[in-house]
Structures are given as C-alpha cells and as structure tokens.
Amino acid sequence: MAFFQSILYSGISGGVCHRERKATLFIPSLRCEKSGVPLAGRGSLFTLASGSPLLGAAFFAPQGRLGSGLHLPFKHSKVFEKGLVISVNESQLGLFYGLSFLCVAIAFAFAAYLYLWVKKQKTENAKIQEVSLLIKQGANTFMRREYLVLAKFAVVAAVVILVLLPSPIWTGNIVDNISMAIAYLCGTALSAIAGKIGILVATLSNGRTAEAAQKGIKPAFLIGFRGGAVMGLLVVGCSLLGVAAVLLVTGDSSILLGFSFGASSLALFAKAGGGIFTKTADVSADLTGKVELGIPEDDPRNPAVIADNVGDNVGDVAGMGADLFDSNVAAMASALVIAQSLSGTGFNNVSMVFCYAILGLFASIIGIATARVGKKGPTSALNSSTYVTTVIYLVLTAIATALFPGFSWRIWGAAAVGLLVGVIIGITTDYFTDDSKPIVKKVAHASSSGPAFTVLSGISYGFISALPAMVGIAVSALIAYKLCEPMGEGYAIFGISMAAVGMLSIVGMIISNDAYGPIVDNARGLAEMGGLGEETIRAADELDSAGNTVKAVTKGFSISAAGLTVISLLGAFMSEANDALAAAGRELITGFDIMSPTVFFGVLVGAVVPAVFSAMLILGVDKNAQRMVAEIHRQFNSIKGLREGKPGVKPEYDKCIDIATSGSLRELIPAGLMSIIATVVVGFIGGPSAIGGFLLGNIVSGLLLALFMSNAGGLWDNCKKYIEAGAEGGKGSDSHKAAVIGDTVGDPFKDTAGPSINTQITVVSLVSSLLSSVFVMFSFFS
C-alpha cells in the first residue's frame, strides 16, 4: 500500500520530475495529453517522485500497468479502454485553497467580534456572578480532566497509527505513517480547541443573558444566540482549516482519514463523557428535587443544581460541537477521498468540495449576523435564520456552479438534495418534540393515567418519529446516487458524499442554534437563583423553550447528517480497500453480497454494536446517578438548615461535580473501546467483505436507535415542560410526577446514548478505512 501511495502524488512540471521520494515504474508510453510531446519512450523505465499533488500535469499511459502487471490504483485517474487519463486544473484548486484560508480568517475574526461584544454586556447581580463562576469552574475542571484522559488515549492511538497506518511501517514509507499520525493529532487538537473556547464563551454568556432578560426577550436572545454563534463559527472554521491544510501539505486525501479519525475519536469521548456527566446531574437533581422534596428545578438548596448547569455546557456545547465538527470533517474527507479517485476531472471535484464548504461557511456568517427576534418569538427567529442561510447557500452554490468550468449541475443537485432533506428532517423532528404540536400534548394527556402510560406512549411515538428521518436519508442518498450515476464510474457514490457535504454545509448555523440552548437554559436557572422576579423568569422560560425545541431539531439533523456521511465513508472504505487489494493482486470489491457468510457475519455483529454501546452509556448514567443521589441525601441529612433553606447555609456543590466528573470519565472509555475493538476483530476474522457487512449493519441499526432515543427523549422533556406550564394539572400534580419519570428515562436517551451513536458509527467507519490494508494482509477468512 505504501509503495503505491508513493507514486500517487507526483509532481511533474514541464516534463521534469521533481526527485524527492522516488518510485520507478515500467510504463509502456507516457506523453503530455495537451501537447502530445513524449515524456518517456515506449517500454522505458520512468521515475516519479512523491510529496506533492499532481499540479499542472496531464498525461496518458496506455493500460497503466507496472512491469509486473499489477494495476496502478491512481487516485486521480481511471483506466479507460484507451489508457489511463489524469487531468488537473492547478489554478482553480489553488484559488479554492486560498479562499478556504481567507474565509476561515473571516469566520475567526467575526467570532472574536461576537465574543468581545458578549463580554461587554453588563452583569451586576452578585448572586448570578457567584453562581456563574461556580458553573465556569466546574466546566473547566471537567474539561481539564477529560482532556487529560483523552490526551493519553490520543498519544497511544498516534503511536499505533505511526506503526500500522496507512500500512505497516516495515512494509512501506515511514513518511506516510508520520503524516497520518500528525494529522490524527491535529484533528484531536483542533476539535479540543474549538470545544474549550466554546465552553469559555457559553459560561461567559449565561449570566449576561439572565440579566438581559430583565429588559425583555430581544436583548437576552441576542446575547444567548451570539454566544452560541462563537462556537458555531469556531467549529466550522477549524474543520475547514484542518482539511485544507492537511490536503495542501500532503496532497493525499487518504491522510484526511487520519485527521477525521482524530476528530471523531475526541468527539466520541467528549459526547459520551459529557452526556454521562450532564445526565448524571440532571437525573439526580430531578429525582431528589422535584419527586422527593418537591422543590423547584433550579433551587440553590439542591446540591446537584450546579453540576446540572455545568452538564448543560459540557454535554450540549463542547459535546455537540465536537460531534458536528467530526461529522463535517468526515463528510469532507470522504468526499475528497472519492473525488481524487475519479477520472479526468478529479481536481475539479476537489475544487467543488472546497467551494461548497466555503460558501456554506459564508452563508452561515450572513445568517448569524442577521438573526433577530421578531413578533413571532425566539423559536421563529432561530428557524428563520436557518431557512435564510439555506436559501443563501443554494443561490451562491448555483452561481459558483455556473461560473466555474468543470463544476457539474448534477453534483450541485446532489448537494442541494442533501441540504433540503436535512431541513425537512428538522421540521419533522420539531413536529414530534415541540410542546405546541399534538404529539407532546397526547403524551401529556397519557401522563394523567400514570408514569407507565407516559413511558409507553413516548416509546411508541419515538419509534414512529424515526420513520420520516430514515426515509429522508434513504431518499436523499438514492436521488444523489441516480443524479450522479450517468457521469461515470465512481460518481454515484461521490454524489452521496456531496449530499452529506450539502447537508452539513450550514453546520455553522446549526451549531449556533444548538449552543444557544444550554446558554439560555443556564440563564433560566440563574434568573431564579438570582431572584430576578417572575417576569424575568417567564422571559427566560420562553427563551429556554425555544432552546429545547431547537436542540431536539439539531440532534435529528446531526444524526441524519451522520447517516449520509457514513454512507459516503462506506464508499471511501471501498476505495481504500480496493487500493490495497490491487496492490496485492486480488479481486476488487464492487459490492457486498448479503448471502455471503462473511458479509452476513459482519452485518449481525455490526448491528448489535450500537445497542451494546448505548446500554453501556445508559448504565454509566444509572450507576453514576445512584452515587450522586446518595450524596444528595447525605447532604440534606447532615447539613443543618439546608432542607429548610436557612440563610447562609449552602450545599457542597463541588462534591456532586466531582462525582459526575470522575464517574463519566470512568464509564466512557469502555464503551468507546468496545466499538473500536469490535471493528478490528471483525476485520481480522473476515477481511474487507466482513467489514463491509459490519458497516452496513452498524449504520442501519445505529441510525434507527439514535433517532428513536433522541426524539423520544426530547418528547418526554417537552411533555414535562408543557405540564409545568399549567396543562394537565400543572406542577405538583400526578400528571407532572409521571412526566418527570418520563423525562428521567428520556434524559440519557436524548443527551447521552442517542447523539453518541452517530459518532460511534463514524468512528468505526474511519477505523475500517484506515485499517483496510491491514485487513487485506492479515485476515482469516477473506
């Protein structure tokens, strides 16, 4: 594999070979496609160097074979009946590299402006300042300890990559292995930086949002949204920066899989760890506060209340940001891997991927800058901004497709279909989770008959809610496939990858909406703890309700985007596996036959992994929450005056934060390692065919479970809030107690297991692609 990679990216300028790392080939003939001037005589040996992409070179080599007769798996080429053609547009690709870095700089500058704007807003309430500081310190403590654990994992993983990837170090080129390991570390580092800064801005924004709510919804919305937008801009900017830099420096899209694996491994642990933390605190606070003691949700007497607010940030800001960073990088990486394997216009397709990503970031910047609350309230403002961003993106990409030579309207159609289906999935998710829609009201009414009916109805509607999203993913993949299939071999799967790029093109706006949720959720609690009055709390409640609705929509969107991404990653896996198979002189993979025992073996194992992964995370929440509930009981029983709320008596908040932190870090590692180990074991047993089946089973099972759990949890959450607003007897009623039970069940569904599954799917897909050459060389039944 490494030998073949050493000849994939060869710099030829004016017929002169740049001699860096060399590979000598026997090529029957080689001539310039444009001028017809021979570059090497028929039947001669020709030396190509590696180290840079093919730029400004177009050449023709009949049959494209080595002297040994092995097929050359050029990533920029395709073997036609008449020969092997490679075509490159140097100036166009260079333009989009430059525009990528320029747009990233604009995004970072705008994020810095928003950060400074939020920081300038006044905060004067001493109690709010005190609690905000506790939340900030708790979040920083968790992030520091989590990143320390992840750093150790990253170092071990980087060493493994250095030794084995893209091919065992003793069989290949050490430079490629070093590049892959560095790219992996860069992926983890950029994701971690984006998450850390996002937490900083979120904890800065919450208190200011609470105090601004005294003046009304509009100023509070603007602070909360702009605080979240900093995270959105950083995530997309860092992902585009990393992808462009890695491809520019190495010229090898396969190295991007290492960068993407770094992002996805951090996302897996950040989302799972943050989810366990936040739901440990949330479940414990609800059970002891609302159910046992009957005290309000954000009552400062509850020892878990600060941990609950910390969890909102580490789970929904850092965790979801890392999740969508991973999805965005994986979508671009898979599209670029496939683009470089296409014939004739490979670099036009590479340019198209970058162009669409740039315009998506630009459209998100416009959408963020123009977001305002109108007469219809904050939910409408968030949705309107998303729709505006979508329209701007579609218009800009259509103009670019018309202007740039080599851009295809079929590929634009695939990207447009992906984005539009993503928006539609968001709308259907909203229907099942919004407390103004009939489904939530039906579950609330069922709660009047007891908690069993709350749980049963929520599970039922949760499964039904998966239907439109699954069908939407299937339809978008099918349309993208059929749109691009006439363009030639390999373009159909490229169309699916561009549908994923299209769906994630406005991810800057999506993350901004999602990060807004925990900021206003914290603000609502701070308004109550700071004694800002009922009118301010009502304004904060309205902002929080919009945040809950949008968070549910965002989760549906991110899961659906991951679905399309992993389908395209399956195509990238086939491309990488075929390179290794060609190098070994073995039959290439054209598909996966379900009747094959090795494929079916992979399907069954792959299908059960998401279920086991989910169970491990939910059990982690269960065990951790039991420890925290015991700690809360201890404090209420041992700290005199705490239960009565006597002045000057405070709970030991740090004890609950420590339980949530240590427990989440202890529970997240086994679940993540289980997924990776299962992939490796299946690969060594059945080879590439078994891995293909494994990925198919994992994708279908994982998407279904993720959508079900995310939507059912969001439904139960908003059912509880709907009753708390006065429906079905209001707070303290039997309906409310039943709804709290439903919400307690749904919390780890929607914020721990559900959104972590899509990251798990991405991780195993990337592990499969990265280890494809190893599985070809070392497997029992392939």
Q: PLM ranges: what are they?
A:
Residues 28-32, 38-51, 60, 64-782:
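Hydrophobic packing and interface segments
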Residues 1-12, 25, 30:
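N-terminal chloroplast transit peptides
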Residues 14-22:
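Intrinsically disordered, low-complexity regulatory segments in eukaryotic proteins
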